[in-house]
A protein has these predicted regions:
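Structured extracytoplasmic
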Residues: 15-191, 210-222, 236-239, 262-324
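Active-site and channel-lining beta-strand-loop segments
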Residues: 191-198, 207
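Beta-strand-dense domains in secreted/periplasmic systems and polymorphic toxin scaffolds
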Residues: 206, 256-260
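Beta-strand-rich interaction surfaces with strong enrichment in secreted/lumenal proteins
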Residues: 228-232, 244
Length: 324
């Protein structure tokens, strides 16, 4: 706690927007303008969504790979209908749910803790939705969003290529790519690309992976390792995460597809591959009015109030002090 108290003022100072940005944050003015516009778009667009309805389906599977043999360890399918509201409680109706554990059970069953799992399907359009694979709780798990204010302290940026896509309506939209480059080798920092609509700067696509794999002995608190033998050091590597958005009502970019491919490992003899896909469809979106700044109501899908970036820096500094 003493170390934490000494470092906290330094961490908060690093968040101060009045402090100068690192000189290598952007290679050119084009990149700086793209980052500025993408940040501003969140205030103009996604936060104005007042309600939406959509259907969602999710499939995930966990395998086990040992002694040159692959087996299915766990599989799950969920389907639901979402009625989301920004300013009042939302509703989600489960249409179907089943899970199978082939190595232990002969038949599929209704998933345990279904209530919590279904909640994770709800998307708040105003959130930085980069915590794929984690629940929508107040925990600090997940990736540090690059475009958060002060993100330049953890990331560098570079404008990439532009491309044109055609929608079923015949409308053509130009996309601009933004490369995300982590400053540190940490599993909570992402490396990849974001594509934005050149007109509205709404997020259209994201493809990324962590800066490095997660390592139990490197990335957990000492208290979590006390009762674990020293030779045990499981690792987890996310191969890729993909987010794709669709344009609805010719205005709102809403999440329509999520995919993640990962693998856990224990040495060279045991692998646990994981695959998840989630599809949102049948959107009906309403909006146009800003939220009440005095309201304390938290819409469904809100991912906690804590600043993940600040927590990341605190943990990083504590880790350095403990190693010293």
């Amino acid at each position: 706690m003493i170390v934490f108290s000494l470092l906290l003022p330094l961490v908060l100072a690093a968040q101060d927007p009045s402090l100068p940005l690192p000189s290598d944050s952007y290679p050119d003015q084009r990149t700086a303008e793209l980052v500025r516009s993408a940040r501003g778009a969140r205030e103009r667009n996604e936060r104005l969504v007042t309600s939406y309805t959509a259907t969602v389906s999710q499939r995930l599977g966990v395998g086990i790979r040992a002694a040159s043999r692959d087996r299915m360890l766990y599989r799950q399918e969920l389907a639901a209908r979402i009625e989301w509201y920004r300013d009042k409680p939302s509703r989600i109706e489960v249409v179907g749910a089943r899970e199978g554990i082939p190595i232990a059970l002969r038949k599929d069953q209704i998933p345990e803790s279904l209530d919590e799992q279904v909640r994770s399907l709800i998307v708040n359009p105003a959130e930085d939705y980069l915590r794929v694979g984690f629940d929508n709780s107040d925990s600090d798990d997940g990736f540090v969003y690059p475009l958060r204010e002060g993100g330049e302290s953890l990331y560098r940026f570079a404008a990439g290529d532009s491309t044109v896509i055609s929608l079923p309506s015949g409308q053509r939209i130009r996309l601009i790519e933004l490369h995300i480059i982590p400053r540190q080798s940490d599993w909570r920092l992402m490396s990849g690309s974001l594509w934005f609509d050149a007109d509205s700067y709404g997020l259209v696509r994201a493809v990324f992976r962590p800066a490095r794999p997660f390592e139990f002995r490197r990335d957990t608190d000492p208290s979590d390792r006390e009762d674990v033998p020293g030779w045990v050091n499981p690792k987890g590597e996310v191969k890729y995460v993909t987010l794709e958005y669709g344009l609805y009502e010719n205005r709102w970019w809403m999440l329509r597809f999520v995919a993640m491919d990962a693998v856990g490992s224990m040495g060279t003899w045991l692998g646990v591959p994981f695959r998840m896909e989630r599809v949102y469809a049948d959107y009906e979106v309403e909006g146009g009015t800003p939220p009440d700044t005095a309201s304390t109501f938290r819409p469904a899908g809100t991912i906690g109030r804590n600043d993940v970036g600040a927590r990341f820096r605190i943990h990083a500094e504590l880790g350095k002090s403990l190693r010293a």
